[in-house]
């Protein structure tokens, strides 16, 4: 739809809209300008229809709004000369409309969707790095940002709006991207933001407690993740069989690829598979020997921990399922690098090994600590906090995990937002059998400094919770802060 005309855009929905040339599509009235199409949806927190007058005042050419109440589907109202077209179930139609508006960019590259509680960022980055090594022009979309490898622009959400996703994909196509690995969040699935995307492969990493403030319970959270497989006609489905939910899903997905590092293939499994046979952890990373439906081999990687072995095997299985040659994948595996802020290691002679990780759920913290322990000769330190205005139930669980798996624990502020930091730390400490084992230090810089200065050279210090983030949310303020830069400064290295 090169001319971006309102009539042509809405015709497939059976709506007779007036002819209007359109420049860009936007959900934010504050960012709308002359010639744009403003889309007014009823969101989780705000109703975009309240901002139609503001968008019209800023010169938009047309408005599409959610139909509700007395206003019927297809109704066209003229407000100050601007057509406002009402559409039923607009949220669920928006991905398709945005795809049409931006000429369906997802059709022009290999698009991979990765969902799960943990491991999405690392798995997408590994997919992009690995495919790039095989000649693709690769991109990532997710928590760290969107863009070609090495040129990623920060993003506000793991999965952007339906409009932003299609626009970002169009920009990637214009930059000649041929491969894109996208993190697909549960929020994004429930809200239909990826509904019209033509994923060639869908990957499931794992499921553990997170986002219950939004989904309510684990059953609804699981159902949200399942949408990637139940509502998309994805040819290649790659499932972590070591996860209980993944194992259950495999019974519904006989054509999927089952991936295991714990020899947990489903009983009498007839489908494709990949399994680790031997895993050796060492101070430089890990060596993995595997077998699969495509053959076997050994991969040497600088990644840390068991869960990164799982991420690596999921990425490998995905690329094999997409017909990338095993021989070439093995040749390029050693070039894979750890992801920024994901079990990222900082070292300098005479100082402890410091690991910065994004772990902010009980399961992720457990896996990060277990990963760090595999590479630890001395004592294991853990510095972490929990975000304010988010799931309070996970706070004591994370406290219990830290007490059980670390030798020393420092509890500090994460992103307190509008909660009292003291109250958040108090919630965390209720999970300790012996709260006296934890040291509470509110200032995050002070907490990180304290751990690194006290730890010995053969110790490992895990700084968990913020990973790649370069800010801290305190009240309504967004402060400049980075665990990575703080650690690098203390160790005298470059982040």
From Swiss-Prot:
Predominant location:
cytoplasm
Pathway annotation: Cell wall biogenesis; peptidoglycan biosynthesis
What role does it play? Catalyzes the addition of meso-diaminopimelic acid to the nucleotide precursor UDP-N-acetylmuramoyl-L-alanyl-D-glutamate (UMAG) in the biosynthesis of bacterial cell-wall peptidoglycan.
Pfam short name (any one): Mur_ligase_C
For this UniProt record, give its keywords in alphabetical order, as a comma-separated list: ATP-binding, Cell cycle, Cell division, Cell shape, Cell wall biogenesis/degradation, Cytoplasm, Ligase, Magnesium, Nucleotide-binding, Peptidoglycan synthesis
Q: Does the keyword Isomerase apply?
A: no
> Which Gene Ontology MF annotations are present?
ATP binding; magnesium ion binding; UDP-N-acetylmuramoylalanyl-D-glutamate-2,6-diaminopimelate ligase activity
Q: Which NCBIfam families match?
A: murE, PRK00139.1-1, PRK00139.1-4
Origin organism of this chain?
Photorhabdus laumondii subsp. laumondii (strain DSM 15139 / CIP 105565 / TT01)
Motif Meso-diaminopimelate recognition motif per record, residues: 414-417
Q: Which superkingdom heads the taxonomic lineage of this protein's source?
A: Bacteria
Query: Any idea what this protein is called?
Result: UDP-N-acetylmuramoyl-L-alanyl-D-glutamate--2,6-diaminopimelate ligase
- Entry binding sites for meso-2,6-diaminopimelate: 390, 414-417, 465, 469
């Amino acid at each position: 739809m090169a001319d971006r005309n309102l009539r042509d855009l809405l015709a497939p929905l059976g709506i007779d809209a007036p002819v209007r040339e359109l420049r860009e599509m936007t959900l934010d009235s504050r960012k709308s300008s002359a010639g744009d199409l403003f889309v007014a949806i009823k969101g989780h927190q705000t109703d975009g229809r309240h901002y139609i007058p503001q968008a019209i005042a800023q010169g938009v050419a047309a408005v599409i709004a959610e139909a509700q109440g007395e206003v019927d589907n297809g109704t066209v109202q003229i407000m100050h000369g601007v057509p406002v077209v009402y559409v039923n179930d607009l949220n669920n139609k928006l991905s398709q409309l945005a795809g049409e508006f931006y000429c369906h960019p997802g059709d022009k590259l290999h698009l991979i969707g990765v969902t799960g509680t943990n491991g999405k960022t690392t798995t997408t980055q590994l997919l992009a790095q690995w495919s790039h090594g095989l000649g693709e022009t690769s991109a990532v979309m997710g928590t760290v940002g969107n863009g070609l490898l090495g040129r990623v622009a920060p993003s506000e959400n793991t999965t952007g709006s339906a409009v932003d996703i299609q626009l970002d994909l169009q920009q990637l196509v214009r930059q000649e991207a041929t491969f894109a690995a996208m993190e697909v969040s549960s929020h994004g699935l429930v809200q239909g933001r990826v509904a019209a995307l033509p994923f060639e492969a869908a990957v499931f990493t794992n499921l553990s407690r997170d986002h219950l403030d939004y989904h309510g319970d684990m059953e609804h959270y699981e159902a949200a993740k399942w949408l990637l497989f139940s509502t998309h006609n994805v040819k290649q489905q790659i499932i972590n069989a070591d996860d209980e939910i993944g194992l259950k899903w495999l019974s519904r997905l006989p054509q999927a690829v089952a991936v295991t590092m714990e020899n947990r293939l489903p009983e009498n499994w007839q489908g494709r598979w990949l399994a680790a046979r031997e895993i050796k952890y060492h101070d430089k990373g890990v060596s993995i020997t595997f077998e699969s439906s495509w053959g076997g081999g050994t991969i040497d990687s600088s990644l840390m921990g068991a869960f990164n072995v799982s991420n690596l095997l999921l990425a490998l299985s995905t690329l094999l399922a997409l017909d990338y040659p095993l021989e070439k994948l093995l040749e390029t595996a050693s070039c894979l690098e750890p992801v920024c802020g994901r079990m990222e290691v900082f070292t300098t002679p005479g100082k402890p090994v410091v690991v910065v990780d994004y772990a902010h759920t009980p399961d992720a913290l457990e896996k990060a600590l277990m990963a760090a322990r595999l590479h630890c000769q001395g004592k294991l330190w853990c510095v972490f906090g929990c975000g304010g205005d988010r799931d309070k139930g996970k706070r004591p669980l994370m406290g219990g995990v830290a007490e059980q798996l670390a030798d020393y624990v420092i509890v500090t502020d994460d992103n307190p937002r509008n909660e009292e930091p003291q109250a958040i730390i108090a919630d965390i400490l209720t999970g300790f059998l012996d709260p006296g084992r934890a040291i509470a230090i509110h200032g995050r810089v002070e907490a990180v400094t304290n751990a690194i200065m006290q730890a010995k050279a053969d110790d490992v210090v895990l700084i968990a919770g913020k990973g790649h983030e370069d800010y801290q949310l305190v009240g309504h303020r967004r402060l400049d802060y980075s665990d990575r830069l703080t650690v690098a400064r203390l160790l005298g290295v470059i982040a």
